[in-house]
Amino acid sequence: MAAATSSIAPSLSCPSPSSSSKTLWSSKARTLALPNIGFLSSSSKSLRSLTATVAGNGATGSSLAARMVSSSAVKAPVSLDFETSVFKKEKVSLAGYEEYIVRGGRDLFKHLPDAFKGIKQIGVIGWGSQGPAQAQNLRDSLVEAKSDIVVKIGLRKGSRSFEEARAAGFTEESGTLGDIWETIAGSDLVLLLISDAAQADNYEKIFSHMKPNSILGLSHGFLLGHLQSSGLDFPKNISVVAVCPKGMGPSVRRLYVQGKEINGAGINASFAVHQDVDGRAADVALGWSVALGSPFTFATTLEQEYRSDIFGERGILLGAVHGIVESLFRRYTENGMSEDLAYKNTVECITGTISRTISTQGMLAVYNSLSEEGKKDFETAYSASFYPCMEILYECYEDVQSGSEIRSVVLAGRRFYEKEGLPAFPMGNIDQTRMWKVGERVRKSRPAGDLGPLYPFTAGVYVALMMAQIEILRKKGHSYSEIINESVIESVDSLNPFMHARGVSFMVDNCSTTARLGSRKWAPRFDYILTQQALVAVDSGAAINRDLISNFFSDPVHGAIEVCAQLRPTVDISVPADADFVRPELRQSSN
């Protein structure tokens, strides 16, 4: 059967299962009538009255805001339907759009042998951020399912990661640890979890070692973006799927372990079927996601995934939040605030109280919990920060979309080694400045369970960034499930808890190489634009943009977040400072 490549076309139909194929990825196009979303004008009486009431206090919106309010989305959000003969598909409505998900849970592990039918060995290639977590979760889930499928780690000969893999229970003697090329050649499902730059440099050899009709599994769409930039595609004799946890590897493992007694917990994941040679691809991908412990799995395409993911980690997930706290810490201390309090009112405020509130109640709850004076400070910060943040986010998205950012990652990976007579330039530290040393002191005296203060100005800047990122993804046609996971859930439930535990490096450097590079590259851009534009506007007494504030109150994303909150992990992640489930070089008991 010829390989079938899935389309990005939106689909809200649910065709009947084909008798000739147990699994079919449906990509029928259907025109979606765009509702009034985000910063669009609305005929809703409630929205009109809210806008009129808020705008009545004398401040006016900018001409840019007026253009935004009257503009329409570039394209409708993508909504992909799929079929599965193993798991239960469920329809959810997010901001007026229908999407399909599969709920997870340990009670579904019994279905894994059916989902993985025909698979005898799963090769997990790489031992970076995702490799250890996914390999261990898969192994443990398959054992619980009483499956004899082998999970085998494939590494480069001489790799220092062999010892780490052995410590996690994978050994050469048991046939669960071996050479990368032998593992690829012997596996029916190959999970390619090496760095993106390494994938770009080695994909031809990887493809040549794969069995015909085997399945290539990705946890990031980066390789597709790299191939597209060269006018290439995947071999037509293999299936290509993706399962992309919306969080760093250590979070994937930590929540899986924490949730063992309560029917599972983990990190939400997206899945995609890019190429299906024999009709098994969707069930295999869903089985993979369920085995990782994903509370819910939503559909995307490989292209939409890499655009939103690479963009998101440079935005609010990592780079932008780093830029925000650096900028605000400097502002607060320059204005006379003590260093300890400035750290609490920036980092601790975002990673503690704000994150917990957004995770459980949404962004509006952050605003509503403030005093009247605090709400004014929030609005001032939000109004001044929204468009400067959007400017950098817009640039970043288009750099990803054009392939420029992907090329940057590949080139950066090559600079890690000496070449052309020039020295190697590995990634440097990002937590050695005064601010982060203050953070060490603050954490040492922090009471157990303390979530820090809720500082209104910081909250306004952070929420403005979050809403600007949501709007960029929405205008670019991403589905609400993808938007919310990449802009909200991954940030507050997976990543920020690591910065709360031990600072910015502990968050950023537990992530993939691509994420670490992007965070370092883009954080200074957000720091700069906030300092040079947003904070200058505040100090000059610029009027609050009431169009932005009223549209924030009425944005339909709040209702969509409320639906997604009901699908969040069953436990909150616990990240002690001496965590042993993180990268080896980041394991220590101090700070």
UniProtKB/Swiss-Prot annotation:
Its EC number is 1.1.1.86. It holds the Pfam family KARI_N. NADP(+) binds at residues 123-130, 156-161, 195-199. Residues 1-52 form a transit peptide. Residues 102-300 form the KARI N-terminal Rossmann domain. Its main location: plastid. Residues 1-20 are annotated as: Disordered. GO terms for molecular function: copper ion binding; ketol-acid reductoisomerase activity. Belongs to the ketol-acid reductoisomerase family. The keyword Secreted does not apply. It is found in: Plastid, Chloroplast. GO terms for biological process: isoleucine biosynthetic process; L-valine biosynthetic process. It comes from Arabidopsis thaliana. This is Ketol-acid reductoisomerase, chloroplastic.
